[in-house]
Amino acid sequence: KFTLDLALTAPDPLVAASNGVLVGVDVLSGARKRYRWSTSYPLSTYLVCFSATNYNTWSVNYNTLAGGTMPVLFYIYPEHDTPANRAAWEQVVPMLTTLRTLFGEYPFINEKYGIYECQFGGGMEHQTFTAQGTFDLGVTVHELGHQWWGDLVTCKTWNDIWLNEGFATYTEALWAEFKPGSSGLPALKSAMAGKKYFGAGTVYVQNAELGNLYAIFDGNTTYNKAGWVVHMLRHVLGDAAFFDMLAAYRATYAFSAAATAD
C-alpha cells in the first residue's frame, strides 16, 4: 500500500475528484482548473480512483466518536439531482453511525467519505470515495462496509476476495439488524434469507479460476455464500466473541492485507 498525491486538470465547468482530501484548486489559463487531492492513509492500487464531469456537489457532516466532524461529500449527475436521490445517498450518515458501533470508528476519519455517480449500475469501494451508479441503500451500505473490509483490511490475493465481499455482504445484514427502528433479529433473518445459495463452488477462488473475472466476483459464492460463512462464524462464536474477533482482525491487519489462513 502507498499514499497518493494526485493532480487532475479539467476544463470548466467540470469538477474533478479523487481519494483523500482536496488540498487545493489552482486556476489555470484556458478556462481550466487543477484539483489537487492527497491521501494520508495508505491504500491499495486497485482502490485509486478519479472522476471528472459536470457534477453537482454537496456535503453533509458526520459527527465522529471523538466529538468532531468529518465531511461526507456527494457528486451527482445534474439530471439525477433530485431530493429523493439526495436523501437516499445521505442515509450513509446514519449508516456510518451504526457501523461504528459494530466495527469501530470509520477508518479514514481524518479525510472524508464520499460517493460519486458513475455509469455502471453497481458500486466500487474506492478508499474514501465510492463510485455508485445507483441510489439503492443495499449497495450504499455494502460499499461503505468495504471501507473496513476491503480497504482498511484488504484481501492478500484474489483467491481471498471472499474476505472483502463476504464481510461487506454481511454488513448489509448487520445494517438491517441494527439500523434505527429495526425489528432486530427478524430483520437479520430476512436479510440473510435473500442471500441463500445451495449450489456448488467454494468461497475461496481456486487458482485455475483466477483468469475468470466472473469466478472471482461471483454473486453466489464470493458474495452470498461468503456472507453466510461470516454469519455462521457469528453463530458459532456468539455475539461477544464474534465482535471481539472483528476488532482483533482489524487491529492485526489494518492498512495491510490478510489471507484466508489468517
Can you say where each PLM-predicted feature lies in the sequence?
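Flexible glycine/proline-enriched surface loops and loop-helix/loop-strand junctions
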Residues: K1, E79-H80, V153-T154, A208-I216, ...
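Zinc-dependent metallopeptidase catalytic helix centered on the HExxH motif
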Residues: F129-S190, L246
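Hydrophobic helix-coil surface modules that form long, contiguous segments used
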Residues: K1-V141, Y170
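Second-shell loop/turn segments in exported
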Residues: P78-A87, T128-T130, T157-W158, Y214-G219, ...
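Conserved glycine-rich, hydrophobic/aromatic-active-site segments
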Residues: A191-H231, L237
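Active-site-adjacent bridging/hinge elements
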Residues: G68-P71, Q119, G138, H142-G145, ...
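Amphipathic alpha-helical substructures
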Residues: G219-D262
